[in-house]
A protein has these predicted regions:
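His/Cys-centered metal/cofactor-coordination and adjacent catalytic loops
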Residues: 112
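Non-catalytic substrate-recognition and accessory regions of acyl/acetyltransferase enzymes
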Residues: 1-81, 86-109, 119, 123-170
């Protein structure tokens, strides 16, 4: 059963938090937050801008495309190892292509924790890195993409995206 939780952020209209609970025990199985966001293609380096725009018909191209940010996602330790996280991402993706969805949304984006297991999880679920390397992402975020620089510290997260149009064409 899906329930809304975390009312403080919801009251301020900043994000919505949801959790799935077992109806018989009220145990939280998993939880996630979503917020409106966008992929601002016009501010990206030309190779990335072209990569994303190439999938959009010319007449529909815009400086940015609507996205939903999955801000937090967690599975209870009691249910880990049962692919609940995979099912949760499938649920979120299907939610935003449902005809009854109240908003247009082209992408699901995440700031994945910079750890190989997290990258493998999101890649297994169809997510791709927006930037091809830590260095490229770090340079863009810290230097506005002007000149290549060497990262001072490792990235804590990496931006990944899933193009929802893929589910429409399956």
């Amino acid at each position: 059963m899906l329930e809304q939780c975390d009312f403080m952020y919801a009251y301020q209209l900043l994000r919505k938090s949801y959790c799935f609970v077992k109806p018989d025990t009220s145990e939280i199985v998993c939880a996630f937050t979503v917020a409106n966001s966008s992929v601002k293609v016009d501010s990206l380096p030309s190779n990335l801008r072209n990569k994303l725009n190439r999938k959009i018909p010319n007449a529909k191209r815009r400086p940015q495309y609507p996205a939903v940010l999955v801000g937090q996602l967690a599975v209870s330790d009691l249910f880990s190892g049962h692919h609940v996280g995979d099912e949760l991402l499938d649920f979120i993706k299907s939610w935003f292509i449902d005809p009854l969805n109240k908003t247009g949304c082209r992408y699901v984006i995440v700031d994945a924790v910079n750890h190989p297991k997290m990258f493998e999880y999101y890649q297994r679920n169809g997510f791709k890195f927006l930037f091809s390397s830590d260095k490229e992402e770090w340079t863009f975020l810290h230097n506005k993409g002007l000149e290549p620089t060497t990262p001072v510290e490792p990235m804590k997260t990496r931006l990944m995206y899933f193009d929802l149009i893929y589910l429409r064409t399956k």
